[in-house]
């Protein structure tokens, strides 16, 4: 929290913490996920740079894709806009391009904003949730 405040990122609201099996390999430790709603005057690029800096400060190391990591901060939505840009060859896209298929993103987001609408597809969050399978509901729990 102090790292966010130090970087002029203010927490407006926060979901419960959600536990899910590691993905795609369930032999790894479980993941813990939370969605926070923030207020900031930072641009998308500056916010992206800041969250990458925070990940590094708390101990994130380069690892193979989908391997367990100490911290993974994604920008799910940025001011309700659909944006794409590049920074040093890395794609930055909001809303997050795979968010609608991830129960660990959608469920906590729904907890914070039951009327959220996907900025790109214009699909309501209720409709996104209704597309999940039963196993997507049983694989996640509030802790």
Model segments located where?
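Flexible, gly/pro- and Lys/Arg-enriched active-site loops
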Residues: 23-31, 45-48, 53-143
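Short, surface-exposed acidic-centric catalytic microdomains
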Residues: 1-43
